[in-house]
UniProtKB/Swiss-Prot annotation:
The lineage of its organism: Bacteria, Pseudomonadati, Chlorobiota, Chlorobiia, Chlorobiales. Pathway: Carbohydrate degradation; glycolysis; pyruvate from D-glyceraldehyde 3-phosphate: step 2/5. It holds the Pfam family PGK. It catalyses: (2R)-3-phosphoglycerate + ATP = (2R)-3-phospho-glyceroyl phosphate + ADP. GO terms for cellular component: cytosol. This is Phosphoglycerate kinase. The keyword Nucleotide-binding applies. The gene is pgk. It is an enzyme of class 2 (transferase). Substrate binds at residues 21-23, 37, 60-63, 119, 152.
Length: 397
């Protein structure tokens, strides 16, 4: 998927309208608790400013439901960004309108204007053409660097491209496409995918798409219990999708017919309930008691998975191995993260598919030990499902 990028265009003296993902977490006092998403946009931002562009940034924050809500203002982001780039950031009062247009036209080379939250307008998520046209009129060049919203056809990601001549990818999107795209198109082998999370239904399209690309699939998370139920094992009080047992059997058969090794846990951690104080112990998957639930993969499985990961040249991880938010049930997830870090050190390409997996890697303190951590949970999932992302399809090829 070759797309033109920031490196392909002339920026000097031009108004560059850039869609970024500044959807950062705020605490009760409106302070940013994690500025990772702002930091990730810096390479593209610096490229525009260093090359004498006039930068207009736009983003959403939270879910204000199409109404102005001061709790979701991007003002804290403007303050943090100005600290990071050591340049004043002008904060607009809105994202469209006469006043904003005047601010955009008044920008000098190397100056930055941050538009107010796009989702204060219902037209943003509705991909309204008139709203898209108004946004587009602010800039001369459009750059999308918000991979996290690339799977949404919104005004600022898709609609806007109908009203601009130049629409290119920023460096963050370029990096995402490079790593995720290479993994799916020409991976170094062996290629191992680790899939976790609670439901088969949420991962069915990913599993299906990956079967034609990977050598091995390691399964963890609560979705393993739907497989076990399908195989006639006791699953106790574990989370099971009863209406997906046939599907689980079909997936096992399909893996076999396609020559993919689909590996399920041999042991799990069992507990009477999901609580930090609950007693827990390892049991073989055929020994789970009726009054217990599986909350993590067991130590034998963690060791098997570690060996598989260390033998791989490309590893893709999407979804935790257990209820990792509770320390006692995070062992399997941490073990996988540690194995990925070791594989990376050995020269493997390791890709973390955003969302919970990224949080798990951060919890293990190993974020800087992976080849690539995707910034888009939903977007990376849809990309792995083989779907076209509207925000990327809309850019100039």
């Amino acid at each position: 998927m070759q797309k033109k990028t920031l490196s392909d265009i002339t920026i000097q003296g031009k108004r560059v309208l850039m869609r970024v993902d500044f959807n950062v977490p705020l605490d009760g006092n409106g302070e940013i608790t994690d500025d990772k998403r702002i930091v990730e946009a810096l390479p593209s931002i610096r490229k525009v400013l260093d090359n004498g562009g006039r930068l207009i940034l736009m983003s959403h924050l939270g879910r204000p439901k199409g109404k102005v809500n001061p709790d979701f203002s991007l003002t804290p982001v403007a303050l943090r960004l100005s600290e990071l780039i050591d340049t004043p950031v002008i904060m607009a009062g809105d994202c469209i309108g006469t006043e904003v247009m005047q601010q955009a036209l008044a920008l000098q080379d190397g100056e930055v204007l941050l538009l107010e939250n796009l989702r204060f307008h219902p037209e943003e998520e509705a991909n309204d053409p008139e709203f898209s046209r108004e946004l587009a009129s602010l800039g001369e060049i459009y750059v999308n660097d918000a991979f996290g919203t690339a799977h949404r056809a919104h005004a600022s990601t898709e609609g806007i491209t109908h009203f601009v001549q130049t629409a290119v990818a920023g460096y963050l999107i370029e990096k995402e496409l490079m790593y995720l795209g290479k993994a799916l198109q020409s991976p170094e082998r062996p290629f191992v995918a680790i899939l976790g999370g609670s439901k088969i239904s949420g991962k069915i399209d990913v599993i299906d798409n990956l079967f034609s690309k990977v050598d091995t699939v390691l399964v963890g998370g609560a979705m393993v219990f739907t497989f076990f139920k399908a195989q006639g094992l006791e699953t106790g009080r574990s989370l099971v999708e009863d209406n997906k047992t046939e599907l689980a059997l079909e997936l096992l058969a399909k893996a076999k017919s396609m020559g993919v090794r689909l590996i399920l846990p041999e042991d799990v951690m069992a507990a009477p309930e999901i609580s930090p104080d609950a007693p827990f112990h390892a049991v073989s998957v055929d020994q789970l008691a009726e009054n217990e639930m599986g909350v993590d993969i067991g130590p034998k499985t963690a060791e098997t998975y570690r060996k598989e990961i260390l033998g791989a040249k490309t590893v893709l991880w999407n979804g935790p191995m257990g209820v990792f938010e509770i320390d006692n049930f995070a062992g399997g997830t941490i073990a996988v993260a540690e194995a990925l870090a070791a594989a990376t050190a050995k020269g493997a390409t390791t890709i973390i598919g955003g969302g919970d997996s990224a949080a798990a890697v951060a919890k293990a303190g190993l974020a800087d030990k992976m080849t690539h951590i995707s910034t888009g949970g939903g977007a990376s999932l849809e990309f792995l499902e083989g779907k076209e992302l509207p925000g990327i399809a809309a850019l100039n090829g």
